[in-house]
Amino acid sequence: AMALINVIVTEGLEDKQFVECWTYGFDALKARVTDSELGMSPEKAEKITGISADLIRKAARMYAMAKPAAISWGLAIDQNANGMQVGQCILDLMAITGNVDVPGGNILGDATTGLNEVGFGFEKGVGSLATKMVGLDQYPAYCNLIMNAHADLMLQALETGKPYPIKFGMYAGNNLMSCTSAEPKRWHDAIVKSLEFCFTVDTFITPSAEASCDLILPLAASAERDGTTFTHYGASMGIKGFAQAATRTGEARSNAETCFAIGKKLHPEWWEDYKDVDAFTTHLRLSNKYEFREIAKEVYIQDECVYYKNECGRLRGDGKVGFNTPTGRIELYSTIFQQFGDDPLPYYREPAYSPQNTPELLEQFPYVLTTGARPYAFFHSENRQVPFCRELNPNPIVEINPKVAQNLGIADGQWVRIWNQFGECVEKAKITEIVDENTIHAQHAWWFPEEDGNEPNLYGTFRSQINNLVPNFHFGRMGFGAPFKNLLCYIEPISENYDTNMQLVWEKFKREDQ
């Protein structure tokens, strides 16, 4: 992304009017991306990425000269220690080409939408205790912007009891030991050792729930509950209301009902404005603009989409013209990053373990490991117990290039061991040219609901857990990021066969009417 900016600004392809009127720090950005040491030329980017300098130039020109144009990015941007700077560069690309909040460009959220759910109850419920949030003193940007304790430092607190012991836990639709945590066995051991009580609200009993929860509250599935959903995180927002369509099983409740019941029990005085869950939903999710029961009748409601909101005061809470930043402009030179102790301009930081940064490891671990691309059948660790989905992807897959397979004697469909200095797991090889010959791509979030769920097996989640190879405590200066996409590893064939018995999956999870 820095190299794309380099091409655009050196060739004068930026939207000069938008840059002059609505951005802050363009000259500083130009100086940074063209700097011989801190900048990023297409040739330098080619050495890092393997993408040719000519192709980088072609892509930059194509984007800059397409009016309008939009950029979409996904989770992978966050999954490295340099992720905040990658995001900064992508936003800079949108800004310098004038593709922000214009028809066909990248649309910003409307401040007048008024969603109440972010931070609901934080001031009343947490108050001065917020100053004791784990990690706040070291990473205030992380803790203040996403309003929770720093994840890696929470692991440290669980293990050491410092700055204070962690004794209570709650999961809500979270399967951290199978899906989201680096070094998951380390998290398992810390949680089991430290927590005196833990409960979860979930539709299924996961390895995380089995290992650490004293109480499991059944969560109503989508068809068993009322609810609302939004698109685009509030930008160009559409609202969908849905009403319960199926009879509930047992004592299942929705998340809203559970929060409402627990909240009223703990502090009834905070809930006096809400006579029932519908009123709570109307305020929290619909900002009192719509009544929930009216929304539930509709298939979809599209809010008015207003462009050029920076020109009419719809991006800022104070109603002033401009963008929601200290300068009122899109900050190419970020005063907010500067406030939190980071460089206000984008920079490239090589991953901690890479061919360039740790060449001494290449003899033992010659392949770049990337993880977590989403298969069609699953969303993270969900749907492993749905036989129709599991048929599409019955086993954990690692994709390797044909040249690598030939060199290592790996056959298509053979089980392999993947390992590095942090841990190991086993997955099933898929030979494909979709991955580079220096790269290994492994699926994540695997567990096997058809297996024994008791300790120590826990549905086999640690056996094919690629996060075993991912370390904690590798994040950026402001505390964000993790190295899920950029590590080193070795891979070798094994004689064992761990193929899923699909007949067992069907028998255990077939529909009641089958």
Q: PLM features: residue spans?
A:
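Long, well-ordered, tryptophan-enriched scaffold segments
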Residues: 1-66
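Extended redox/cofactor-interaction regions of prokaryotic respiratory oxidoreductases
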Residues: 2, 47, 92-212, 220-230, ...
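Short acidic (Asp/Glu) and glycine-rich catalytic loops that position anionic groups and cofactors
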Residues: 35-41, 65-73, 166-170, 234-244
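Structural signal for hydrophobic packing residues in well-ordered secondary-structure cores
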Residues: 5-12, 37, 53, 60-67, ...
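Hydrophobic alpha-helical scaffolding
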Residues: 19, 31, 35, 46-49, ...
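Acidic/polar loop patches that form or flank catalytic/metal-binding clefts of enzymes
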Residues: 15-17, 56, 70-71, 99-109, ...
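Short beta-alpha connecting loops at secondary-structure transitions
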Residues: 218-224, 237-248
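Long, contiguous, secondary-structure-rich segments that constitute the structural scaffold
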Residues: 245, 249, 253-299, 386-399, ...
